[in-house]
């Protein structure tokens, strides 16, 4: 890895990793090469970017402390706002650089995703993006089958949170990092994609590989509980009906509301985030 990339990666990791995140560098060109122009990131190909994902540890290290600090405010989406807060700290830690941050949920006015998170994770070498095209002579006929990323250490027990772009920093010699193919057999890939598309509520697709760490039972219960009841589950008081202003020492942003992706997208590289019905948790 180039010294410049290693230095920036270390600084970003110092900001995010203590809170349960991982970061992976990639070139914008690697991402753009897989997609039609409408989905390209509008930066020179050698531009340095970092993919950010959350591990199971993020729940205890980042989300719960964030909720405890903000639980008397009306949060529209606590997980996304927690992630936005921590990604904002990356910008603060590198004030000398121009930084653009795209969260996984962001969309253009026409609802086109600003980043195709699973494609970015694949090209960054963070997680293998398993798709229908990875199954020879697949058994699904005319059914729509969405793809899913699997992490070599966490299986499906992680979430892609966004990308950090560094316009003006170009790394043409950065070597590509291939994602680890941790579900190599046809039978296991079929089981993974069927579990993700048809049985996602039971969490089992996330165990496509034996994970080093899973979501805790508390974390699973949190994401399986209706949003209005989640704070009570953690022993926190419910906020008042009117949003209170954020404190000056804990800034956070309000993400755009989420809407489902366009189910008519034909090319599998265009699948946004995690696409089956509203999943019980990230």
From Swiss-Prot:
Substrate binds at residues 104, 115-118, 129-131, 149, 160. Changing residue 161 to Q: In MAHCC; results in decreased stability and reduced stabilization induced by cobalamin binding; has reduced affinity for cyanocobalamin and reduced activity in dealkylation of methylcobalamin. Its cofactor is FAD; FMN. One of its GO terms (cellular component) is cytosol. GO terms for biological process: cobalamin metabolic process; demethylation; glutathione metabolic process. Can utilize both FAD and FMN. Changing residue 161 to G: In MAHCC; results in decreased stability and decreased methylcobalamin dealkylation activity. Residues 234-282 are annotated as: Disordered. Keywords: Cobalamin, Cobalt, Cytoplasm, Disease variant, FAD, Flavoprotein, FMN, NADP, Oxidoreductase, Phosphoprotein, Transferase. It catalyses: 2 cob(II)alamin-[cyanocobalamin reductase] + 2 hydrogen cyanide + NADP(+) = 2 cyanocob(III)alamin + 2 apo-[cyanocobalamin reductase] + NADPH + H(+); apo-[alkylcobalamin reductase] + an R-cob(III)alamin + glutathione = cob(I)alamin-[alkylcobalamin reductase] + an S-substituted glutathione + H(+); apo-[alkylcobalamin reductase] + methylcob(III)alamin + glutathione = S-methyl glutathione + cob(I)alamin-[alkylcobalamin reductase] + H(+); apo-[alkylcobalamin reductase] + adenosylcob(III)alamin + glutathione = S-adenosylglutathione + cob(I)alamin-[alkylcobalamin reductase] + H(+). Widely expressed. Expressed at higher level in fetal liver. Also expressed in spleen, lymph node, thymus and bone marrow. Weakly or not expressed in peripheral blood leukocytes. Coiled coil: none annotated. Cobalamin (vitamin B12) cytosolic chaperone that catalyzes the reductive decyanation of cyanocob(III)alamin (cyanocobalamin, CNCbl) to yield cob(II)alamin and cyanide, using FAD or FMN as cofactors and NADPH as cosubstrate. Cyanocobalamin constitutes the inactive form of vitamin B12 introduced from the diet, and is converted into the active cofactors methylcobalamin (MeCbl) involved in methionine biosynthesis, and 5'-deoxyadenosylcobalamin (AdoCbl) involved in the TCA cycle. Monomer in the absence of bound substrate. Homodimer; dimerization is triggered by binding to FMN or adenosylcobalamin. Interacts with LMBRD1 and ABCD4; the interaction ensures the transport of cobalamin from the lysosome to the cytoplasm. Forms a multiprotein complex with MMADHC, MTR and MTRR; the interaction with MTR could modulate MMACHC-dependent processing of cobalamin. Heterodimer with MMADHC; the interaction might play a role in the regulation of the balance between AdoCbl and MeCbl synthesis. Belongs to the MMACHC family. This is Cyanocobalamin reductase / alkylcobalamin dealkylase. The lineage of its organism: Eukaryota, Metazoa, Chordata, Craniata, Vertebrata.
